[in-house]
Amino acid sequence: MSLQKGNPAMEIKGSVALVTGANRGIGRSFVEALLARGAAKIYASARRPERLADLAERHKGIVVSLKLDITQPADISTAARQCRDVQLLVNNAGINLQAGLIAANDLAAARAEMETNYFGPLAMCRAFAPILAANGGGAVVNMLSILARVNLPMYGSLCASKAAALSLTQGVRGELAKQGTLVVAVMPGAVDTEMERNFPPPKLPPADAARAALDGVEQGLEEVYPGDMASGMSQGLAHDPKAVEKDLAKYLPR
């Protein structure tokens, strides 16, 4: 499931977290997993915060709903002003427009995926790095995909954006090491969410992905590979990366 020990582990119990894209799928599972581990406060954010009303109502005083579109600098600035106590930043929000690189009609999907999957997390890391430093270092979790490490042509532009986000994660890890911030790359295989509805089973339950990510935080791990698909592909990439690439190259855009 995981690789490589990072900075000292962070305890979830009693911590303050911010989760992007918290209204459904893995993001909602993150909120539930943080609650189960005793987080003191969870800023649950989404572009449409009304979709978080039920969570905030059930967990008054702990779950705080927050309007946040990570492609909008003004939203990020507002969140950084309002959430000065954050110790754990979970960059979960993302999109998959299921587009190829050449087969797509234009570059719109590729640009949108880079904006949300790369520039959004980068902007969040930049805004919250000083906040994490002021609160003892804390941790950043970047939800990526095993496809950050190898391209699946049917989702070609998604894979490119996730590869960029993996490189971002490594760079941010290096820059924030001196302030004691753990930066975790989470790279699952297919997860059973609306975003991956067209991907064939087996798919990992989103709750399992969130739990594995938080296990990584509490163990001080830099890379986490939730589920059998991710761990198997990671081993394949270590042994014969070209063979994995050739195998995935058969899955072309429709």
Where in the sequence are the language-model features?
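Conserved glycine-rich cofactor-binding loop
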Residues: 23-24
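Conserved glycine-rich Rossmann-like NAD(P)H-binding loop of the short-chain dehydrogenase/reductase
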Residues: 35-54
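Rossmann-fold cofactor-recognition segment
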Residues: 58-74
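Conserved mid-core segment of classical short-chain dehydrogenase/reductases
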Residues: 96-111, 154-157
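Active-site helix of classical SDR
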Residues: 125, 161
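Residue(s) in the substrate-gating loop at a strand-loop-helix junction
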Residues: 145
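C-terminal helical subdomain
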Residues: 185, 193, 197-235
